[in-house]
Amino acid sequence: MTIPISEQIEIIKRGCSELLLEDELEQKLAQNRPLRIKAGFDPTAPDLHLGHTVLLNKMRHLQDLGHHALFLIGDFTGMIGDPSGKNTTRPPLSREQVAENAKSYQDQVFRILKPEQTEVVFNSAWMDRLNAADLIKLAATHTVARMLERDDFGKRYQSNKPIAIHEFLYPLIQGYDSVALRADIELGGTDQKFNLLMGRELQKHFGQASQCVITMPLLEGLDGVNKMSKSAGNYIGITESPGNMFGKLMSISDELMWRYIELLSFEPLRVVRQWQQDVGNGRNPRDIKVLFAQEIVTRFHSRQDAEAALADFESRFRRGGIPDDLPENILQAGKEGLPIAQLLKQTGLTASTTEALRMIEQGGVKLNGEKVSDKTFRLSCGQMVIVQVGKRKFARVTICEEK
């Protein structure tokens, strides 16, 4: 059954920040053919977290509508380093690092994308064939003034911070990727808008129909404030154990839950709207959070793993009388981690480290429902825990890297 274009547009726009241009997309959809959907990933971080999957989820939505995904691994651009949103020059990766990280990407993306509707491509396939003259011709299509329109370049120029010449090539090469792939739509984060529009301009320059651009928001981490990232310690990795994944999802605030559902859930919009109506009529948001956490764990593991994670969570937490609205704490730690006694003092669960050590000796401290007996225990960056002292004191704590 053919889905009306208006309904397709609604599905495509779900959760997106911007769609450029909607009338052009309607014209492409009216051609009634599989569109070529491009999203590029520089293999700088081999392990994906849920923040990375926002783009992949949108690609999956488009696949469900019958379109073809072009999962572009920027092995060539990865050796340049994308400067988007950065105030300093990023060091390039070696070809060996890029190859190793690219393999890890391929092992993970098919947990979301349909393999039969996905083409994994590497931009070195066409970029390695360009000679010096070709690159100079590509660079000649745009001016330095145009490049300085990009926010991060402009700020660095105004503050006299260095901009390497090769960094100007990055948006040009990303744009040329769209030419090489004849992309109909390109997806990217809001911080990539300049580069995505570069693809439209270069396609027009090379006599192609310009791609539509869909920008997706950057997913907030567990703290609900900063972008999800490993360095901030507020992430959920897609290869984490079912129990860790489930527990972290259950730890997010009720407000953040709706944001995660909008960007990460595959449940139909009518179902999500019904959930919102139910909560408005008095249903406990925790019930919805359980359904959402089970969906995500099932996607990256299995239904059986999700059910086991729920059972474990209920046995350790819900029967332990943990309140719904736990205070949120974001604590910093160095490479050695944060000592448990310092954590208890900094969160105010104990008045001093001496009291903290005494409570541990007495068996009155739990992390994620498990009793702590080691007074020298340290929590590492990236950990998210629910801490309990005695029967009535609780806190939710995220450990991030010391700045």
Swiss-Prot record:
User: A Pfam family this protein belongs to?
Assistant: SYY_C-terminal
Q: Main EC class of this protein? A: ligase
Q: Where is this motif: 'KMSKS' region?
A: 227-231
PROSITE patterns (alphabetical):
AA_TRNA_LIGASE_I, S4
Question: Where in or outside the cell is it found?
Answer: Cytoplasm
S4 RNA-binding domain segment(s) = 338-399
Annotated organism of origin: Nitrosospira multiformis (strain ATCC 25196 / NCIMB 11849 / C 71)
Keyword annotations from UniProtKB, A to Z? Aminoacyl-tRNA synthetase, ATP-binding, Cytoplasm, Ligase, Nucleotide-binding, Protein biosynthesis, RNA-binding
Q: What does this protein do?
A: Catalyzes the attachment of tyrosine to tRNA(Tyr) in a two-step reaction: tyrosine is first activated by ATP to form Tyr-AMP and then transferred to the acceptor end of tRNA(Tyr).
**Primary localisation category:** cytoplasm
Which protein are we looking at?
Tyrosine--tRNA ligase
Q: Name the Gene Ontology molecular function terms of this record.
A: ATP binding; RNA binding; tyrosine-tRNA ligase activity
UniProt GO cellular component terms: cytosol
> In chain numbering, where does the motif 'HIGH' region fall?
43-52
Annotated GO biological processes are: tyrosyl-tRNA aminoacylation
By sequence similarity, the record places it as follows: Belongs to the class-I aminoacyl-tRNA synthetase family. TyrS type 2 subfamily.
SUPFAM superfamilies found in the cross-reference section:
Alpha-L RNA-binding motif, Nucleotidylyl transferase
* Quaternary context: Homodimer.
Instruction: Write out the coiled-coil annotation as residue ranges.
Output: none
Q: State which Enzyme Commission number(s) the record gives.
A: 6.1.1.1
Isomerase among keywords: no
Which residues does ATP bind?
K230
> Known catalysed reaction(s)?
tRNA(Tyr) + L-tyrosine + ATP = L-tyrosyl-tRNA(Tyr) + AMP + diphosphate + H(+)
Record InterPro entries: aa-tRNA-synth_I_CS, aa-tRNA-synth_Ic, Rossmann-like_a/b/a_fold, S4_RNA-bd, S4_RNA-bd_sf, SYY-like_C, Tyr-tRNA-ligase, Tyr-tRNA-ligase_bac-type
The record's Gene3D superfamilies line, in alphabetical order, gives: HUPs, RNA-binding S4 domain, Tyrosyl-Transfer RNA Synthetase
Asked if Ribosomal protein is a keyword of the record, the answer is: no
Q: Which domain of life is it from?
A: Bacteria
